[in-house]
Structure formats: structure tokens, C-alpha cells
Amino acid sequence: MNPLLERLCARLSDTIPPGTETPYASPSHARTEEAPWSGITGEEALAVARLPASDILDILAVAQAVRSARKGPLATTCGIVNAKSGRCGEDCAFCAQSSHHDTGAPVHALLGPDALLRHAEELARAGVRRFGIVTSGNALSEREFDAVCHAARLLRDRVDIGLCASLGQLATGSAESGNRGERARRLKDAGISSYHHNLETARSFFPQVCTTHPYDDDIATVREAARAGLRTCCGGILGLGETWEHRVELALTLRELDVDSIPLNFLHPVPGTRLGHRSPLPPMEALRAIAVFRLLHPQRDILVCGGRETTLGQWQSWVFAAGANGLMVGNYLTTAGRALAEDMEMLAALGVGEIPRNGEEARA
């Protein structure tokens, strides 16, 4: 094994909780009670990223050992609904819903509560643990926001599933409301327990991806959600043309924000977008990226989301070996995912149990 990976294994042995068995820690090894290991350093992450391809299985083994020690054998699942689609004024280079692109993506107004209820019930019946209401655009109007809160209260009372919202910016003012700072608290009161808002990429690479809002708006929204007591779900998209330095920069920003859950997406190139010409990441590079994020974030939920079918193909089940402990299942915003039953069967075949929903409400 590469000496760097051997050192990481030794560190893992020193920091796992008592009684936890992993491939790299013997029961007799001295351990601290609850070592506050926050993960490897940025320099170490870049070193792991640059190890030769022949080391990939060892990299995955170390990441899986960290996952096993810190997150256990259980996984989380989530599904989303495209509750408001298209006509987005942002110019995100990857996005089929941007009005700056001609992609033929679906366009529709905010779905009503009955439609959202049907989507949530379908996912709950399949055993999915969380349901996300996702809308296009920088932020919702006050009327739209009120409608989402009304629907959330209905879902909270009718469906046994955790509720997540992804409604754009929360922390800046709007012409209609004057203050979106209250929105996070209103969502929590309505039964939403988690707020999703991706940074998409590193601050230093962001101008290559989006020019219609500043990176600090996204940072402020994540912080606003956390201040309101919502779990924060925040990650990005890999394969936009960023370097490993950018990926590690993003991961360290997420560590600074102390987010609860990190969704990792992979670019699914859509014709008509500025990145429609790009090729998907090679599968082994994608798995290495998941492993690096796990080593940087040993305590957090890491979910593999959009683009996994295109990027990973037959390697999709390996995301757990790479350190992930969750999947987004079903369809995505404008692209079809794998059949829901197929994903749930894969989880069962892998012996990956599901985190009880009440176990997801508290911070890891």
C-alpha cells in the first residue's frame, strides 16, 4: 500500500470510536473515546487525488473504512420533484433550465399540493426516506413561497417521509418581501427539516460557471438555513472543467460551513447548454472524487446524486465502496434517473440498510 494511505489507515485506527471494527483497525489497538477527527488536510487530499491509477482500490478501501467507522452500514435515500421548471434567469453553464440556453427542457409553474402529495407518497411507498421540493429560479415570489409552506404542512401530516426544500436564495432581500431572512424559519415551522442549496463548485472557479449572482449569496443562504435550525444539504457538481484543486477547495468550504449532508452530482452534458460539449468524468475519477470527499468529511452524509447513471454506468454500486452513504433515487430535475425499484433492489442486494428517518433529523 502507498505510504500515504498507510499513514491514513494508522490515523483512522487511532480515531475510530471504541468497539468499531474496520479493515484497518484491530480490537486491541488503543483508541480515544471520541476523537474529534475532522478529516484529512487539503494537502493530503490533493496527494490522494494524484496517486497513480494502480492505487485506486486502496484509496477506495480507506474511504470505505472511514465510512464504516464513522457512518456505519446504514445509508440514506432521497428523491426529488421538479416542482417549478424552467425560465430561470441564472446563467449556470450546466443547467438545462436556464433561460440563457435553448434545451427544450420542460417549463411549468409551481405544482399544486395534490401533485406534490402524489410524488411524496410514491417515494414513501418505495421506502425512500426523504422528499425534496425543488424549484427553478433565484428565489420564489411570496405567493409561491406561501404555497410551498402550505404544501409542506399537508405532506408533514399525510406522508411518513422527511421533507427537504430547495427553493433558491434565502438570505437576500426581494422587491416583494423585503426580507428573505425569515423564510428559513417559516419553512421549519411548516415541517421542512432540511434545506438544500448547492455551491456548485469552488469559489475560485465559480465565475466560469455562473455570472448572474455572487458566490457569497449562496454561502449566506446556507448559513441562514443553519441559523434557523434546518439541516443543511450542500454540495456541488463535478466534471464542469474544474481541477482537483477546485474540488478540494469546494470540500474545504463545505467543512467551514459545517454542512450536514453533501450531495455530489456529476455533469450530465445537456445539448444546448454551455457545457453540452463536455464528456462525462471517467468512472474511476468519479469514484476517487467521492473517496476524497469522504476522507475530508468523515462525519457527514455524502450522497451521490445527478449524473451517476451517465458517469458511473455499471460502477454505480461502487459508490458505497468509495465512501458514500446515500443515494438520490428516481428522476432528477430534467433528466431521467434509473428505475426507482432498480435502485432499491441494488441497496438491498448490497446489504446496505436504511437510516431510520428519526435518525436523520439530528446532526451526525
Swiss-Prot record:
Keyword annotations of the record: 2Fe-2S, 4Fe-4S, Biotin biosynthesis, Iron, Iron-sulfur, Metal-binding, S-adenosyl-L-methionine, Transferase
One MF term in the entry's GO annotations: biotin synthase activity
Pathway(s) where this gene product acts: Cofactor biosynthesis; biotin biosynthesis; biotin from 7,8-diaminononanoate: step 2/2
Binding site for [2Fe-2S] cluster: 164, 233
The Radical SAM core domain, residue ranges: 70-308
Assigned protein family: Belongs to the radical SAM superfamily. Biotin synthase family.
Annotated [4Fe-4S] cluster binding sites: 88, 92, 95
Classification via NCBIfam families: bioB (TIGR00433)
This enzyme's EC code(s): 2.8.1.6
SUPFAM superfamilies: Radical SAM enzymes
One Pfam family here: Radical_SAM
Region (Disordered): 14-36
Taxonomy, superkingdom: Bacteria
Cofactor note: Binds 1 [4Fe-4S] cluster. The cluster is coordinated with 3 cysteines and an exchangeable S-adenosyl-L-methionine.
Single GO BP term: biotin biosynthetic process
Catalytic activity line of the entry: (4R,5S)-dethiobiotin + (sulfur carrier)-SH + 2 reduced [2Fe-2S]-[ferredoxin] + 2 S-adenosyl-L-methionine = (sulfur carrier)-H + biotin + 2 5'-deoxyadenosine + 2 L-methionine + 2 oxidized [2Fe-2S]-[ferredoxin]
Function: Catalyzes the conversion of dethiobiotin (DTB) to biotin by the insertion of a sulfur atom into dethiobiotin via a radical-based mechanism.
Subunit composition and interactions: Homodimer.
Protein name: Biotin synthase
PANTHER family reported in the protein's UniProt record: BIOTIN SYNTHASE, BIOTIN SYNTHASE, MITOCHONDRIAL
Cofactor: [4Fe-4S] cluster; [2Fe-2S] cluster
PROSITE patterns documented for this protein: RADICAL_SAM
Phylogenetic placement of the source organism: Bacteria, Pseudomonadati, Thermodesulfobacteriota, Desulfovibrionia, Desulfovibrionales
